[in-house]
Amino acid sequence: MLNTSTSGGSGVHVVLASSSSASVNGLKNYYIAKIQEKEIVLRDKIENLRRLQAQRNELNGRVRSLKEELQQLQEPGSHVGEVVKVMGKKKVLIKISQEGKYIVDIDKSIELKDLTPGVRVALRNDSYALHKILPNKIDPLVSLMKVEKVPDATYEMVGGLDEQIKEIKEVIELPIKHPELFESLGIAQPKGVIMYGPPGTGKTLLARAVAHHTDCTFIRVSGSELVQKYIGEGSKMVRELFVMAREHAPSIIFMDEIDSIGSTRTEGGKGGGDSEVQRTMLELLNQLDGFESTQNIKIIMATNRIDILDPALLRPGRIDRKIEFPNPNELARLDILKIHSRRMNLTRGINLRKIASMLGGASGAEIKATCTEAGMFALRERRVHVTQEDLEMAVAKVMKRGDESNMSFKKLFK
């Protein structure tokens, strides 16, 4: 009996020990889970705090900017003037429209080297002290005229105009790239050139090629864009056009269809519209006289009717060279054909010289249209190559002429 009771007591001790160790493990796991739960909550709180701090910083920045804007709005207005001449280290001559000219003080924050003639500035309302330099005021329509991307045209894309390329290089490209040559000779740089001739002879293409090779800011404007509805708007656009050209020098101003504003003036005018056009042309003449040839601003004009232009616009000193663009001769037509057909899939035995002889009196644009039409004839017959007959039919279609014995002409118009 004693032995039995003794063994039973040891069993009870074993059960109690195992149950106590299980409870300890359970408490340990419980607190580990609680700690992990609190760590997750803590991480969420930290992320939320960081997000709130970022929002606080953003709102503080907005408050500061609004305070600065409010302070600027509460400041008294300033007079707007234009720098005429720097009179010393602390004085400058300013022109204010409707009021006249004043010699004013310069604020300490203004650099004297930035005060060049023509710069717009702000003057304090009470003391007339110069305290801010303003950007030049340019019409958005004028800003759109500037070609940001350099044109991709090159001299190799211009065919049959070797003499014209040489002349425009001397007037436009050489002064921009090598002004020291003109200084060593003691002669003034040319200001501009006018290109005239029938439509489609390559005037615009050559102007784009010049801008490509000189790496200049290319500002293209049509003369009709300067004809505005209201009085003074056209003259204002001309002034701002030259202001933008000075800011982005070296620059080339290409004025196409100049005859729309540069026609010969008549006595007394024919009406309000003609008077406004004449005022625009007078402003153009004033701007051509107002800039020096050394300012790296060159003018290229183009027209189909040089006979109706005003002599004042064409005089030397404003336009220094007149370049004629006639319709190409047979050799030039052959060069243009080779340029436009170099990427075409032509069959063997194509006689381009014969096509050039058939295009008598055609312009460069008509020759290009001939190559395009020849390709269209090939597409119409579901071919991937252009034949001699396609080119001859294209000539007949573009030039609208042919004889009854020409089989390709009969095939086109049957």
Swiss-Prot record:
Domain of life: Eukaryota
Subcellular location per the Swiss-Prot or TrEMBL entry: Cytoplasm; Nucleus
CDD domains in the cross-refs: RecA-like_PAN_like (cd19502)
Gene Ontology CC: cytoplasm; nucleus; proteasome complex
Gene Ontology molecular-function annotations: ATP binding; ATP hydrolysis activity
Binding site for ATP: G197, P198, P199, G200, T201, G202, K203, T204
UniProt-recorded name of the protein: 26S proteasome regulatory subunit 8 homolog
Species annotation: Naegleria fowleri (Brain eating amoeba)
